[in-house]
């Protein structure tokens, strides 16, 4: 299944655009290979996502089923493109990097729940962003953070936002 097929009328050219919106956390500071960037649930990894995009999803237009779908839509030829959006999160305000990443990518920080709780009363400046709103960055509509919601980070990662629209993940200590 194609994410997007579009036609550039000025160039008279059709494109197959694959889209991915992901959030990855650096396992530690410093230079990292893509396999060291984990999704919030730790099952997803940046290297695997990129491999799937490049070796499977971008190749859809070259498969027999993809060729048939294009033919049915009246498209003879299309050029594949990929667009990856989202954010990369760094451990406790430390920097990490990987060759091939846009140096201007959106960033945030991540904290273990124990360290986050030690940040005096500063953590009450944050609000909880439920997963459907991770891209939204809307502080006013995010849920005010209370102890019960913060306790959720003992079990699974949660994304928070502050009034400066900075986002962070708080993750279990283990």
Feature locations, PLM:
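Intrinsically disordered, low-complexity Ser/Thr/Pro/Gly-rich regulatory segments
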Residues: 1-174
